[in-house]
Amino acid sequence: MSAAQSTLSTNAGPAVGTPPPQVLLSARGLTKRFGGLAASQDVSLDLWRGRIHAVIGPNGAGKSTLTNLLSGDLPPTAGTVTLAGQEVTGRAPHQISRMGLGRSYQKTNIFLPLTVQENVRLASQSRELHRPWNPLHWIDLATHNEALQARCDRAISLAGLEDRRHIVAGTCSHGEQRQLEIAMTLATQPQVLLLDEPLAGMGVAEAERMVELLLRLKPEHAIMLVEHDMDAVFTLADHLTVMVNGQVIASGTPE
């Protein structure tokens, strides 16, 4: 073990007397090469339900590349990704999303002219598969719409945006827009959340609200957090991975 690695405890096991959390996503030997450049080199990690796994490192370390490899936005040169026991390596992002993975991006991805509720409802609809024709489709449609609205309402509530649901997204504050993006992700009912710098550009009060939101989401999800705000990282992280030049140089509990 290197000197850098020795600064992090590797005792990441569950507390005595509590059931071990479930591994929801595993990556083994993930490598991504662009010509002669290795943006990600032999990266392995596990994401557990009920834990927040933070990935830190300088700009260009490979953190966003890793996130894109896990979500399917980039195909790996080598290595495998397993989600909820099924290998998803090489699958399209929309397929991986429907299997239970949601993500946010460094740049907020929302529909600015639409209301908060309309944004979340669109995200909720995106997880739906095409259904065969049904002669009783009006009854089926009513049931379907109720379920869709229930997912939408729950996502808005979890994200703390109940009193903003009818506000046009473009008029929301930066922090609220980041909360909205997470609400849209939650509307797809993911088990695993990949969050790429969710606190970027936030003031103190907005950052505190985001930390509270992530702590609310933690018990039911496996979360990977890419973040430069070290105060937030050490408040939230159960496990910490440090990347430099596409490689993991340290991984363990932040003690």
Task: Describe every region a protein language model picked out.
Residues 2-255:
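Glycine-rich phosphate-binding loops of nucleotide-dependent enzymes
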